[in-house]
A protein has these predicted regions:
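Intrinsic disorder/low-complexity segments
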Residues: 1-16, 139-160
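A short, surface-exposed helix-loop junction/capping segment
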Residues: 24-34
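Active-site metal-binding core of divalent-cation-utilizing nuclease and nuclease-like domains
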Residues: 37-87, 95, 125-138, 148-152
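Nucleic-acid nuclease catalytic cores
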Residues: 93-143
Length: 160
């Protein structure tokens, strides 16, 4: 299957997560509004866990994720900051800027666990920074998504 067809097929998969991703980012915005920026990651993690719970959103903090190779479950696990629902990985940062290694960490989690959606949230700036990604299993790649969960081509503004 070509990369274009594979990505198009996955767009429908990504779109079904639009509402829950919107709710998670909204909860993070609420936490950021109350706590402001510059605190340590564990503070934001705990506050976000409480906010998600208050919103009735199922989430697990520091959940061990199993890794897969082909159809085999590996013994190696990773701990994601959050798993929302059963398959959305949320990584929290509190940095002046998101760096390529922060994205790489999320992408590794998504690829090795075959999680369809990943959200990277940065509380370290005066305005909350969030990025949405989708995992394309056929090509084993993670793609940037816009707020409507459509694949988008990143530009310099998206990664500042």
């Amino acid at each position: 299957m070509s990369k274009v067809k594979s990505k198009t097929k996955n767009m429908k998969t990504f779109e079904k997560y639009e509402d829950i991703v919107f709710q998670v980012i909204g909860a993070a915005m609420h936490v950021h509004h109350i706590l402001n920026y510059g605190l340590s990651e564990p503070i934001y993690q705990e506050a976000l866990q409480l906010e998600l719970s208050d919103e009735g959103i199922k989430s697990e903090r520091e959940k061990a994720l199993h890794c897969f190779y082909k159809n085999y479950k590996l013994e190696k696990t990773y701990k994601a900051d959050f798993v929302v629902g059963d398959d959305i990985i949320v990584e929290i940062k509190s940095r002046a800027n998101l760096l390529p290694e922060h994205r790489a960490q999320l992408f590794n989690y998504m690829r090795l666990t075959q999680s369809p959606i990943g959200i990277l949230i940065n509380f370290g700036r005066s305005h909350l920074q969030s990025e949405r990604y989708g995992y394309v299993k056929d090509t084993n790649e993670c793609v940037l998504l816009d707020r409507y969960m459509h694949i988008k081509v990143p530009n310099s503004q998206d990664i500042l």
